[in-house]
Amino acid sequence: MLINEGRLEIIGGAWSMNDEACTHYHSLVDQFTWGFRRLNDTFGSCARPRIGWQIDPFGHSREQASLFAQMGFDGMLFGRIDYQDKEKRLNNKMMEFIWKSSPNLGKKRADLFTTAMFNTYSPPPGFCFDILCNDEPMIDDPDSPDYNIDRRIDDFLRYAVTQASHYRTKHIILTMGGDFTYQHAEMYFMNLDKLIRTTSLVELFLAYAQIQARAYKTNHIILTMGDDFHYQQADMVFGNLDKLIKYTNQRNGSVVNVIYSTPLCYLKALNDLNLQWPTKSDDFFPYASDPHSYWTGYFSSRPTVKYFEREGNNMLQASKQLVVLTNLKNYDKSLEHFREAMGVMQHHDAVSGTEKQFVANDYSRILYESMDHAGEIISKAIGKWSGMESSTAASFKIFTCLQLNISSCAFSEKSDTFMAVVYNPLSRPVSTYIRVPVQGNSYVVRSLTDGVYPTVQIVPIPEGVQKIPGRKSNATNEVVFRASDIPPLGMLAYAIAKKIQENVVEQPQSASFISNELYNISVNTNGDLTVHWNKQNMNVVQSFHYYIGAEGNNENFINRSSGAYIFRPKELSARNFAYSGSYKIYKGPVVQELHHTINDWVSQVVRIYSEEQHIEFDWLVGPIPVKDKIGKEIVTRYSSNLQTDKTFYTDSNGREMLKRVRNYRPTWNLELMEPISGNYYPVTSKITLKDEKKQLKLNILVDRAQGGSSLEDGDVELMLHRRLLKDDAFGVGEALNETAFGEGLVVRGTHYLFGGKVKNTDTFVLKEKELALKKCDFGMFSLTSGLNKALPPNVHILTLEPWKDDTILLRLEHLFEVGEGQRMSQPVEVNIQNLFSTFSIESIKETTLGANQLLSENKPMKWEPEMNDIIQNEEESRQTVGIHDNVINVLLKPMEIRTFILTVKRTSL
C-alpha cells in the first residue's frame, strides 16, 4: 500500500549498493537486473526504481551513470565528492548537473541528471537523533526546564538556508542518517518529527538550510536525516523530526518550508522548473577527502577477492547460458543463490577490499559455495547436451577445477586418462591455450570432435607456485595445448592420456632470450625484463618495485596512514628490489616461457604462445615480509620509449575508455599534495598509452581490478599487492594485513601486454578485444554449438539466461566505440531469428537495460543543458524490433546494449 500510494519509494534497486571503481559492467548489469526482478516479483511494477542512489561509494564512474541512464532512471544522487571539486561546485552552484555519461550513446540514451549531496548522506550538524549520537533532542514542553524548541529550530533553519545557497533551485535534500544509525529508529524519528514540527532549535535548522541553499541553483534542497546504522529506535527519531517540521513551518517570517519527501519527488520539483543545467563528461576518480587522503588504495586492496569475484562472474554466465541452451530444469534456486552471492560481492565494501578480514572470508565462502553448486549445473547441462550422460555410466560427472590459479586440479593429477571439456561463452569461434596440472612427464591429447591430435608441450610448474603456502597439489607439470575453433556458445572435448615414455618435460635451455617474429624478450643486468619489438621502434622494460606505506595516528591530515581505503606512500618514489634471483628459459612448439625470479617472494613467468600476438606476464607476489615492521605496497612498472605527454587512458568498469592527464583534473585547478596516489586511477580491464607522433600504442590488460597510473611519460604502473600494519581510520578498524596458512598472503595474477604500430585499426583493436573477452572463458571439461552461426566480431551476447515463465533474457552489445575502429565501429545489423540451435524465437519484447520495463513505456524526465553546452547531433531513435517474415533484425550502434525478453519454441537436443 505504501509503495502504491507513493509514500514509500524504492531507490537504487540493485542487490547491493555497488562499488564503482573495482566492478565490471557485466556484474553491475546483472546485480541490478536481479534486484529489479525481486522487487517486481514482491511489490509489483509500482516499486520500479527510478533513482540511482550511490551515497557511499568512494568515487563515481562514468559507466555507472551510463548504465543508470540506459535503465531509464530519472536521475542519480550521491554523497562523496573530492573536497576540491566540492568546494568549487558549492561556490558556483554546480552541485547539480547533467552527466554526459557516454559520448558514444549521446544525449538521449546516456545523459543523466545528477545531484551531489551537501552533507554526504548525514544529518545537519546537531540534528542526529539516533541513539548513536549525542545531539540534543527536541523538547517542546514549555513547562520543561529543558525546553529548547525555539533555539533548535533556529539552528536548523540556518543550516537549511546555508545548504540551499549552494544549489540552483529552492529545493534541497537534507540527509538524516549515517553509519550504523537507526538502530533505534523509533527514537530517531521521534526527534525528527519534533525537529520538523518545531523549527530556536528551529532557527539553527533554518540557518543550516540557508547555508545549503546557497550552493544550489533552485529554492529546493534535500536534507538527509540519517546515517549508517541509524534508525534503530525509529520512533524516537521520527518523534524529533515531526517536531522539527512542525515548528519550522510555524515560524513567522521563515522562508523555509519543510516536508517529508523522497528523492524522486525532489527531482520532480527541480524538473518542473524547466531550468538549464551545467554538464560534466568525465568521472569522479580519484576521490580525496582531504589533501593527504586519496582513496586509491582500495583499487588494489584484497587482490585475491577481486580475482575471485571476476572468476565468479565468468562461471555464473556459463551456468546461465548452459541452462538456457539445454533447457535444464530444477536449478532455479542454485542460480538464484549464485546471482545473490555475486550481488553481494559488488558491494562497495566487498569487491573493494574494504571489509574486515572475517567478513572477506565469509563473502568468499558464500561465493565458493555458489560456484561449487554451479559445477553441478554445468556437469548436468554438458552431460545432457553432449549425450555423454545417457551413453556412459550413471556415475558420469564433470569436475570443475577451482584452484587452477595455483596450478592445482585434483582430478587431472590423479588420473592417467581423463577428458577435458572446454566451453566457449562467446558469440563467435575462439581458439585458446589450455593448461592442465599433472604429475606425469609425458601426455598425449586427442580431440573427441574430429580425432585430431593437437601439438602438446609439457612445461614445469614454476617453483614459486609449487611453494605457495596451503597448496596441497602434487602436480609439478602442466600439459599445454591449443584448443582451436571452439564453436560459439559451444564446446570441444579432448581426451588426455598419460604416455609410457618419460623425461619429455621441457628442460631449461642455455638461451638468454625468448622470441618470435614480433618480440625479443630477455633479462638485463639489473634483473629487469626487456621487450623489444622486432619490426617497430618500440621497447619496454618491465620491473617490480615497492612503496613503504605511510604510518600515522590519523588525528589530522598530515598524519594519515596508508590503509585499506587510502594509498599514501611514505616516500616520493617507489623503492627498487635488490635483484637476488635468476631466470630459466623453456622453449617448445606451443609456448616459450621465461621463469624469472626477483627474490624469495617476487617472481613471474613471461610467456609468448606460438599463434598469439600478446605477451603474458604471470606474476607471483608474497608472502610480503613485515618482520621489519614496515608495510609494503608492491607494483610492477612497464617503462616504454613512447612519448605520451602526461597522457594515458583507463577503462570505466571494463567498457568505455577515459583520457587521464597526470597532475590534472578537467573541471578544477588541482592542488596536489600527494603526487603518487593522487594520480592513481581504477583499472578494471585495461590501461593504455599512445604515442600520437609514432602512431604506437601500448595496452596492458589485467585479470582483476587494480590501481594504476602513468607517473612518468611512457610508463605504466600497476599495483599488485598490499600488506600494511596500520589502519587508515576510515571505517575498517583493522590493518590490511592479509595472511593465509600462518604466513602473509601470496597472490598470483596475469597481465597481458599488447602493442605496436596501429596500421589497420580494425585488426589491432579486434585482437585486443578478443584477448579481453577470452579472459572470460571458463576452462572446464566438453561438443556442439549453441549458435547456428557466429555473430559479427563486433557483436557480443552479453546475457543469455533463464527468466520468468519459461522466457529467456537476451542482451546483445556492440563492442566498439565510435572511431575506435574503421569498419568495426560502424552500426551492425544481425538477424537473431535462427541464431540459436536449441530454440527458435516466437515473440520478442525489448526492455530497458534492467529488464524491468518495456522500452516503449520508459519516459524519463528530460533535462536541458546550459546554452554553452555543445549539443551533440542526435540520431534517430532506435528501430523497433519484431518478427517480420520470420526475420528479427537487431541494429546495434557503437557501445549500444539492447535487452530483450524472448518466448521460444524448443528443439530437441
Tell where the protein language model's regions lie, with residue ranges:
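Short, acidic/polar N-cap/turn motifs at the starts of alpha helices
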Residues: 96, 442, 509-511, 528, ...
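Flexible, active-site-proximal loop/turn residues at the rims of small-molecule/cofactor binding pockets
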Residues: 58, 82, 498, 850, ...
